[in-house]
Amino acid sequence: MAPDIATSPEKQKALNLVMTQIERSFGKGSIMRLGDATRMKVETVPTGALPLDLALGGGLPRGRVVEIYGPESSGKTTLALHAIAAVQQTGGIAAFVDAEHALDPAYAAVLGVDIQNLLISQPDTGETALEIVDQLVRSTAVDVVVIDSVAALVPKAEIEGDMGDAHVGLQARLMSQALRKITGNIGKTGCIVIFLNQLRQKIGVTYGNPETTTGGNALKFYASVRLDIRRVQTLKKGTEEFGNRVKVKVAKNKVAPPFRVAEFDIIFGKGISRLGCILDMAEETGVVNRKGAWYSYNGENLAQGRDNTIKYMEENPEFARNIEQLVRQKLEMGAVVSANSVAANETDAEEEYVEEE
């Protein structure tokens, strides 16, 4: 007679056994409970946006492949440059493979990147770019490598050929071969490899999402973290646009529960609004209260409107540090905010947001 496994303890025992076997076969993090709040002990690098760090379970994981994709001007390069700045601030070495030949050193410096010590390469072909990435990773000296972007990794055969020549699947094969070669070394050296990618439209798709990323399917499989970044609001003062509100969805995460969403501001010419992130988290955790347009702390009004409150925090850095410390304490105690809860499956249209004068 077959054993009765309908009872809850028996099922739990069987579940624990199969999860252990799967993790033993395919590695730690290959399966986990979606509601598990504890993150794996993987070293991470902050992204510059506190809500995104929460959504990722700590930050960008070391020794992993990360893909950041989204429409044009959504903040992909800005996010990558903030990660480079965070690595450099801890004494790490960063490299930027500029396949698009579009890096703005002045903007990178504003974001905190040490451009004097940033390694930069502007390769002519995709093969050269990926070979440079492989050698940098194998050197064990580099902590983060950013490739901007996958779409610009043009195979040598395509460059040497004529306009109009068909090169079906050439870039996809190149990416697949390169990732097979690079991935093992990345895990051993602890280097973060960040691929920035563009979106394309699939032709003839009637049902489902017509968007896809360039470079074939290999990167989707090899990436431990995939971030989908979208512009959802245009920030304005009167009629003047001064930034974007962006939403980042963690489309894939092998080191923490996926499908979380983070929202934050990117200010033109300044990058991610760190104080804006702190204020949003302070409001969600109850450190700062908002009634109508007024923000208050310990019963005392700070300023009217979000923009004015951020300005107040800029003028009072000690107060801002105190608020950040209180927010982090609340989060460490398990406070649930929008960034560490599972995302709703919805499509948001881009909106305009007008700040108070």
Curated annotation (Swiss-Prot):
GO terms for cellular component: cytosol. It comes from Cyanothece sp. (strain PCC 7425 / ATCC 29141). SUPFAM superfamilies: P-loop containing nucleoside triphosphate hydrolases, RecA protein, C-terminal domain. Belongs to the RecA family. The keyword Cytoplasm applies. It comes from the Bacteria. Keywords: ATP-binding, Cytoplasm, DNA damage, DNA recombination, DNA repair, DNA-binding, Nucleotide-binding, SOS response. GO terms for biological process: DNA recombination; DNA repair; SOS response. HAMAP family: RecA (MF_00268). It is found in: Cytoplasm. GO terms for molecular function: ATP binding; ATP hydrolysis activity; ATP-dependent DNA damage sensor activity; damaged DNA binding; single-stranded DNA binding. The keyword Acetylation does not apply. This is Protein RecA. Can catalyze the hydrolysis of ATP in the presence of single-stranded DNA, the ATP-dependent uptake of single-stranded DNA by duplex DNA, and the ATP-dependent hybridization of homologous single-stranded DNAs. It interacts with LexA causing its activation and leading to its autocatalytic cleavage. PANTHER family: MITOCHONDRIAL DNA REPAIR PROTEIN RECA HOMOLOG-RELATED, RECA.
